[in-house]
Swiss-Prot record:
Protein name: Inorganic pyrophosphatase
HAMAP family tied to this protein: Inorganic_PPase
Chain's role: Catalyzes the hydrolysis of inorganic pyrophosphate (PPi) forming two phosphate ions.
Major enzyme class: hydrolase
Cofactor: Mg(2+)
GO MF annotation, one: inorganic diphosphate phosphatase activity
Superkingdom of origin: Bacteria
UniProt cross-references to Pfam families, sorted A to Z: Pyrophosphatase
A cellular component annotation (GO) from this entry: cytosol
Annotated keywords: Cytoplasm, Hydrolase, Magnesium, Metal-binding
Quaternary structure annotation from Swiss-Prot or TrEMBL: Homohexamer.
Binding residues for Mg(2+) 1: D67, D72, D104
Protein localization: Cytoplasm
Length: 177
């Protein structure tokens, strides 16, 4: 398998369209991660079923978040996407998140061309409020059985704030490359 970080760029960040590689399908409790050294997807662990992901979960190639991993993405779609699918996505916001004291922000996006529902989602406020609540609950509690209180959704930001986070992550990637 080719390394997504070698074949895909982050995308047109200023234009709000990014490349996303999906790791975990929405509804899955399998914590699948991209292993950069092996250029392969790896099952890290199986979470309790109650903590299945409320959205697809992936990353933006050629980025590094403050935790040392590629910048995470929450990708909202009607149906789960398979592990390894990559696509262009439209940035609609950012979830500011802390995991065990480390910044671990999540970019929120939808497919760039989703003629079913996604084209209607231009901002976070366009998403169903119940989905926002589910995302917050999930990320505030998914580690509770292991070590309660180690994760916290701190705030939500708009697409412009998300683009800043992406650009900072690209800078970190370029410094280590």
């Amino acid at each position: 398998m080719a390394d997504f970080n070698q074949i895909l760029t982050p995308g047109d960040v200023d234009g709000g369209i990014i490349n996303v590689v999906n790791e975990i399908p929405a509804g899955s409790n399998h914590k699948i991660e991209w292993n950069r050294k092996l250029a392969a997807f790896q099952l890290d662990r199986v979470e309790p079923a109650i903590f299945a992901k409320p959205t697809n979960y992936g990353f933006i190639p050629q980025t590094l978040d403050e935790d040392g991993d590629e910048l995470d993405v929450l990708l909202v779609t009607e149906q789960p996407l398979a592990t390894g699918v990559f696509l262009e996505a439209r940035v609609i916001g950012v979830m500011k998140f802390v995991d065990d004291g480390e910044v671990d922000d999540k970019i929120v996006c939808v497919p760039a061309d989703d003629r079913n529902n996604g084209n209607a989602y231009k901002t976070l406020s366009d998403l169903p409020q119940q989905l926002i609540k589910q995302i917050e609950f999930h990320f505030n509690h998914y580690k509770d059985l292991k070590k309660a209180g180690t994760t916290k959704v701190e705030s939500w930001g708009d697409a412009e704030e998300a683009k800043k986070v992406i650009k900072e992550s690209i800078e970190r990637w370029n410094k280590q490359a």
